[in-house]
From Swiss-Prot:
Expressed by the venom gland. It is found in: Secreted. The lineage of its organism: Eukaryota, Metazoa, Chordata, Craniata, Vertebrata. This is Weak neurotoxin E3. Belongs to the three-finger toxin family. Short-chain subfamily. Type I alpha-neurotoxin sub-subfamily. Its main location: secreted. Binds to muscle nicotinic acetylcholine receptor (nAChR) and inhibit acetylcholine from binding to the receptor, thereby impairing neuromuscular transmission. It comes from the Eukaryota. It comes from Micrurus pyrrhocryptus. Keywords: Acetylcholine receptor inhibiting toxin, Ion channel impairing toxin, Neurotoxin, Postsynaptic neurotoxin, Secreted, Toxin.
Length: 27
């Protein structure tokens, strides 16, 4: 499961994951 920000899939990945404003990719 990959957690990433809608605006920047590669930036601050873990931070956005922890904050909760994330999008989840089933890949």
């Amino acid at each position: 499961l990959i957690c990433f920000n809608d605006f920047s899939p590669t930036a601050r990945t873990l931070e956005y994951c922890q904050i909760g404003i994330t999008t989840y990719n089933p890949s």
